[in-house]
Design a protein with these regions (language model features):
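Acceptor/aglycone-binding surface of glycosyltransferases and processive sugar-polymer synthases
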Residues: 4-20, 25, 37-118, 143-163
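Walker B catalytic motif
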Residues: 31
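Hydrophobic helical membrane-anchoring modules
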Residues: 42, 86-88, 112-194
Length: 194
């Protein structure tokens, strides 16, 4: 258990965790998330096959989003599709907070997001692609707040931070020649009891 001296929020918690990470890979994951734990083995396989970043996806074949706000889900799906079209983003779900990153690669990036909930994960995906990292995706069924209290998502302040990184990513993708990056996808393993 770590003490976070940087203050509240996902970005500060993430920075503290990265500073104290000792392993080769860093798993970024919300402690109150359910379901995607099953994807960790597939994420590890992709990392071991050479990926620098593996992101879970709700929007590729085999992925789904259950629960949560319909408006939030629709905004997320539309924003990801628009961002992919505008920038050539290889990930189908750049905004998800469930990522595994090679620590040595992560240390080469400066994460700047300060507020905005999981916008730091979006920033990470953008900067990883611009740097030409090898990326992978694992489809998940994300179960969002079906129980356990209300989400802390606030469209106003969080939306501004996501918009900031959306616009920054579009501008950078037009300014900086894109380094080749490809996405490898693995379907999560299923239990076969036949």
């Amino acid at each position: 258990l770590l003490h976070n001296p940087d203050g509240r929020g996902v970005a500060n918690a993430l920075r503290t965790g990265i500073r104290h990470a000792a392993g080769e890979y860093v798993l970024i994951f919300a402690v109150d998330d359910t379901g995607p734990v099953l994807a960790i083995d597939e994420m590890l396989r992709l990392m071991e096959s050479g990926c620098d970043l593996v992101s879970c996806t709700r929007y590729a074949r085999g992925g789904r989003r259950l629960g949560g706000s319909r408006i939030g889900g629709l905004l997320s799906r539309i924003a990801n599709a628009m961002f992919r079209r505008a920038t050539g983003m290889k990930l189908t779900d750049a905004t998800t907070g469930i990522k595994m990153v090679r620590r040595s690669a992560l240390e080469s990036l400066r994460l700047e997001a300060t507020t905005g909930g999981w916008a730091v994960a979006f920033e990470l995906a953008i900067k990883a692609q611009l740097a030409g990292w090898r990326m992978g995706e694992v489809p998940i069924i994300s179960i969002d707040r079906l129980f356990g209290g209300a989400s802390t998502f606030a469209l106003g302040p969080w939306g501004k931070e996501y918009l900031r990184w959306f616009l920054w990513g579009v501008a950078q993708s037009r300014r900086i020649p894109r380094l080749p990056s490809a996405v490898m996808t693995r379907q999560p393993a299923t239990s076969d009891k036949s």
